[in-house]
């Protein structure tokens, strides 16, 4: 077999303080868009012991009860007492929300006067989309497994299977791969790491046994596990204090977990709490759809797409495609197909991906367990656009 290498991805579950903040920011966005689809939202959240603060710039016609959103989100995650890290009903909630800067408003949407195709990017920046044929989701296996372990931790906590679990937790998976002419082929899972918050009553042996039986076994396919797989299960020995009591949280600090687990590339912009004029979010969504469509259409086995913007300018400054040598046709021809089939103007992304639609916890759902590779009709950017290319090859 070809020479192998190890690659690691991590995840955190919904009770991690940073992820709590992402979810509150996106719950605010959902509430604004549900009443006013043209809401302009840049909502940040921070938290520490017994306190949550929501702050930022929001221009909306919606009537939003920010404090209620904070408390409901914390409660739904499981932060219902100081013992578990935060008491949703009794913590201090601070709100400092102002209107969007009029300078930004005139440059981006002309104070709501511009047509969709004229709407400029809400800021400069560059975003990346990635796809790989190593999983059905067309996502990296290391990232998929780490993310699913985190989601499973929450599931067995909430359904009572592992009643000793508390909301906070982190996961990490190391996969052994080999490189098949640019495509990534998983061989086995090398290491599984889980650190989960727990109550005082459970022993470390019970934690390890339950995690193997109820979390790891249902998530990681047997074919990837062998007698050499290493398990680190709560390696610190104690994780009773967690959530915002254990450490502070802030929106936008888990951007690799939100995307591709360290694969591909990242332009640095976070997603949560941002309406679709913010290309950090909408730009990243459209390039994921482009990359996924390239792989799903058989144009390449693995692919990255970059787009970049200037504030106030609708058209992207650049679009880039790299198939890591796995393309069936030259990358420049794939780039041409992408430019013909995808509209990268922010106003048109909003329409084509229906990003102004709030409600149904639409963006809240994205804020835990990843924005990509999810099988949910609200994740419109995961819909594959068929890309026709046979004719071009023959030509």
UniProtKB/Swiss-Prot annotation:
It is an enzyme of class 2 (transferase). Pfam families: S-AdoMet_synt_C, S-AdoMet_synt_M, S-AdoMet_synt_N. ATP binds at residues 16, 168-170, 236-239, 253-254, 270, 274, 278. This is S-adenosylmethionine synthase. The lineage of its organism: Eukaryota, Viridiplantae, Streptophyta, Embryophyta, Tracheophyta. GO terms for biological process: one-carbon metabolic process; S-adenosylmethionine biosynthetic process. CDD domains: S-AdoMet_synt. Pathway: Amino-acid biosynthesis; S-adenosyl-L-methionine biosynthesis; S-adenosyl-L-methionine from L-methionine: step 1/1. Homotetramer. Its main location: cytoplasm. Mg(2+) binds at residue 10. It is found in: Cytoplasm. HAMAP family: S_AdoMet_synth1 (MF_00086). L-methionine binds at residues 57, 100, 278. Its cofactor is Mn(2+); Mg(2+); Co(2+); K(+). Belongs to the AdoMet synthase family. Catalyzes the formation of S-adenosylmethionine from methionine and ATP. The reaction comprises two steps that are both catalyzed by the same enzyme: formation of S-adenosylmethionine (AdoMet) and triphosphate, and subsequent hydrolysis of the triphosphate. Its EC number is 2.5.1.6. Disulfide bonds: none annotated. Keywords: ATP-binding, Cobalt, Cytoplasm, Magnesium, Metal-binding, Nucleotide-binding, One-carbon metabolism, Potassium, Transferase. GO terms for cellular component: cytoplasm. Binds 2 divalent ions per subunit. The metal ions interact primarily with the substrate. Can utilize magnesium, manganese or cobalt (in vitro). Binds 1 potassium ion per subunit. The potassium ion interacts primarily with the substrate. InterPro entries: ADOMET_SYNTHASE_CS, S-AdoMet_synt_C, S-AdoMet_synt_central, S-AdoMet_synt_N, S-AdoMet_synthetase, S-AdoMet_synthetase_sfam. GO terms for molecular function: ATP binding; metal ion binding; methionine adenosyltransferase activity. K(+) binds at residue 44. It catalyses: L-methionine + ATP + H2O = S-adenosyl-L-methionine + phosphate + diphosphate.
């Amino acid at each position: 077999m070809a020479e192998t290498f190890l690659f690691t991805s991590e995840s955190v579950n919904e009770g991690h303080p940073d992820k709590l903040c992402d979810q509150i920011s996106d719950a605010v966005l959902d509430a604004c868009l549900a009443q006013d689809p043209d809401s302009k939202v840049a909502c940040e959240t921070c938290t520490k012991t017994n306190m949550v603060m929501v702050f930022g710039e929001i221009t909306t016609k919606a009537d939003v009860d920010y404090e209620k959103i904070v408390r409901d989100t914390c409660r739904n995650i499981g932060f219902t007492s100081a013992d578990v890290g935060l008491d949703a009903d009794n913590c201090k909630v601070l709100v400092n929300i102002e209107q969007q800067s009029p300078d930004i408003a005139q440059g981006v949407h002309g104070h709501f006067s511009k047509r969709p195709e004229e709407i400029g990017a809400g800021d400069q920046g560059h975003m990346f989309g990635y796809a790989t044929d190593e999983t059905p989701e067309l996502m990296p296996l290391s990232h998929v497994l780490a993310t699913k372990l985190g989601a499973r931790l929450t599931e067995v906590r909430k359904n009572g299977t592992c009643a000793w679990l508390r909301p906070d937790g982190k996961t990490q998976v190391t996969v052994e791969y080999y490189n098949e002419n640019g495509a990534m082929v998983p061989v086995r899972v090398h290491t599984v790491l889980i650190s989960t918050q727990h109550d005082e009553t459970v022993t470390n042996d019970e934690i390890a046994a339950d995690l193997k039986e109820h979390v790891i076994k249902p998530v990681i396919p047997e074919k990837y596990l062998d007698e050499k797989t290493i398990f680190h299960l709560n390696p610190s020995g104690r994780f009773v204090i967690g959530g915002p009591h254990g450490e502070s949280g802030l929106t936008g600090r888990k951007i690799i977990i939100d995307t591709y687990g360290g694969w591909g590339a990242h332009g640095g912009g976070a997603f949560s709490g941002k309406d679709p004029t913010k290309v950090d979010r909408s730009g990243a969504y459209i390039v994921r759809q482009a990359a996924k469509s390239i792989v799903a259409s058989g144009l390449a086995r693995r692919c990255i797409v970059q787009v970049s913007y200037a504030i106030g300018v609708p058209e992207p400054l650049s679009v880039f495609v790299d198939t890591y040598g796995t393309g069936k046709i030259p990358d420049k021809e794939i780039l041409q197909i992408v430019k013909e089939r995808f509209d990268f103007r922010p106003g048109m992304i909003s329409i084509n991906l229906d990003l102004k639609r709030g409600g149904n916890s639409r963006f809240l759902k994205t804020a835990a367990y990843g924005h990509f590779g999810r099988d949910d009709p609200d994740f419109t950017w995961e819909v594959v656009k068929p890309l026709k290319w046979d004719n071009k090859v023959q030509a």
